[in-house]
């Protein structure tokens, strides 16, 4: 049996302000830093250690991972960073307030943009400073691969091949792996692992800063999965994620 630990980054400054973030590189809030520390302490308490880590190219995931590894006394392990684990790109919604957007377009429309499987938001023009072709961290990635907007289906299309080609290989070698990423890149993995329907993934809420453990068989099929920590706190955190994008 193998174990894989997934962690969504701690609360970011834009999570706190209820803004669409996507590929915008924002920092952790004070609460997010505390969540990352708590995740690290919880993993340490439960006896977890890691051989290799994976993360996105965005600071909030990197910083969460670094804090967790520091709490575990494992800042020395290898970390592989990839744009393929980035958050879903929210296109022209990036930087907009979710509640204000719901008031303008309607909650149902915003829910579709946020959580539907195959409907992307309005795209960014390549001249827009928010477009990833303007960001030097993506300068080595072919321009045609960089999104101007994404639906979850698009995110799955870049995350799952990376799982298969890179992360799964390390798990099968017996390495203890942690992945620190984002709400939608992790939803892509959970959908794949649990064979969720498009309707079921719409209802999936992954809370910030709480370790999600998958136990996998020899073929990397899931045996079971569970969050670490207090159940009532986990439930409250999931409800908080679900409430985003609603009128206040």
Curated annotation (Swiss-Prot):
This is 2,3-bisphosphoglycerate-dependent phosphoglycerate mutase. Substrate binds at residues 8-15, 21-22, 60, 87-90, 98, 114-115, 183-184. It catalyses: (2R)-2-phosphoglycerate = (2R)-3-phosphoglycerate. The keyword Isomerase applies. Belongs to the phosphoglycerate mutase family. BPG-dependent PGAM subfamily. Pathway: Carbohydrate degradation; glycolysis; pyruvate from D-glyceraldehyde 3-phosphate: step 3/5. One of its GO terms (molecular function) is phosphoglycerate mutase activity. The active site is at 9 (tele-phosphohistidine intermediate), 87 (proton donor/acceptor). GO terms for biological process: gluconeogenesis; glycolytic process. Catalyzes the interconversion of 2-phosphoglycerate and 3-phosphoglycerate. The record marks 182 as: Transition state stabilizer. It holds the Pfam family His_Phos_1. One of its GO terms (cellular component) is cytosol. It comes from the Bacteria. NCBIfam families: pgm_1, PRK14115.1. It is an enzyme of class 5 (isomerase). Its EC number is 5.4.2.11. Keywords: Gluconeogenesis, Glycolysis, Isomerase. It comes from Borreliella burgdorferi (strain ATCC 35210 / DSM 4680 / CIP 102532 / B31) (Borrelia burgdorferi).
């Amino acid at each position: 049996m193998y174990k894989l630990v997934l962690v969504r980054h701690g609360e970011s400054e834009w999570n706190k302000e209820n803004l669409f973030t996507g590929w915008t590189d924002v920092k952790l809030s004070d609460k997010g830093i505390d969540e990352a520390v708590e995740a690290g302490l919880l993993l340490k308490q439960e006896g977890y250690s890691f051989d290799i880590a994976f993360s996105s190219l965005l600071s909030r995931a990197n910083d969460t991972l670094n804090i967790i590894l520091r709490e575990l006394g494992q800042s020395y392990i290898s970390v592989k960073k990839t744009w393929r684990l980035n958050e879903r790109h929210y296109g022209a919604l990036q930087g907009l307030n979710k509640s204000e957007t719901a008031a303008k377009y309607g909650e149902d429309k915003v829910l579709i943009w946020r959580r539907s499987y195959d409907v992307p938001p309005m795209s960014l023009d390549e001249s827009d400073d928010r477009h990833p072709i303007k960001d030097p961290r993506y300068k080595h990635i072919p321009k045609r691969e960089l999104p101007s907007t994404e639906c979850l289906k698009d995110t799955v299309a870049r995350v799952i091949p990376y799982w298969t080609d890179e992360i799964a290989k390390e798990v099968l070698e017996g390495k203890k792996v942690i992945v620190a990423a984002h709400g939608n890149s992790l939803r892509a993995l959970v959908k794949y692992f649990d064979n969720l329907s498009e309707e079921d993934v719409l209802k999936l809420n992954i809370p910030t800063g709480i370790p999600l453990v998958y136990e996998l068989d020899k073929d990397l099929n899931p045996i079971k999965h569970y969050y670490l920590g207090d159940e009532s706190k986990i439930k409250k955190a999931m409800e908080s994620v679900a409430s985003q994008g609603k009128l206040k």
